[in-house]
Amino acid sequence: MAPSKSIKSVVICVLILGLVLEQVQVEGKSCCKDTLARNCYNTCHFAGGSRPVCAGACRCKIISGPKCPSDYPKLNLLPESGEPDVTQYCTIGCRNSVCDNMDNVFRGQEMKFDMGLCSNACARFCNDGAVIQSVEA
């Protein structure tokens, strides 16, 4: 009975990490000419405008790949954002949303081992699995 709970915990962890990875990859999908264009795009999109409409109105492009063209250097991340901060928040968020929920469901010595594995998986995911775009052109 205990091994099946452990397997369920790992499967849930992997599924939720997959969802988190999808959200992380969405971050750099719009590229803008400059900071003014980026601010315009963010304001438009926050106000409810669709991504294509906001991109067209604000001199931005919607891209499908991970890197912006050289003439559209500004990504969705703020200029003062840095990879260490993003990695730290990713790890904290992953542990809080995935590992803490597992701890609430199952209790016991085996769960402590699973929590350690979950924390390690979050750290590996946030350090290696996430694609962080540079904000410098």
UniProtKB/Swiss-Prot annotation:
What is a GO molecular function of this protein? toxin activity
**Disulphide bond pairs:** 31-68, 32-60, 40-58, 44-54
Which SUPFAM superfamilies does the record cross-reference, listed alphabetically? Crambin-like
Signal sequence extent: 1-28
> Which biological processes are named by the entry's GO terms?
defense response
From which domain of life does this come?
Eukaryota
* Positions of the propeptide segment: 75-137
**Record's subcellular location:** Secreted
Which keywords describe this protein according to UniProt? Disulfide bond, Plant defense, Secreted, Signal, Toxin
One GO CC annotation, please? extracellular region
What is the protein's major site of localization? secreted
Name the protein family.
Belongs to the plant thionin (TC 1.C.44) family. 4 C-C subfamily.
Function noted in UniProt = Thionins are small plant proteins which are toxic to animal cells. They seem to exert their toxic effect at the level of the cell membrane. Their precise function is not known.
**Name this protein carries in UniProt:** Leaf-specific thionin DB4
Upper classification of the source organism reads: Eukaryota, Viridiplantae, Streptophyta, Embryophyta, Tracheophyta
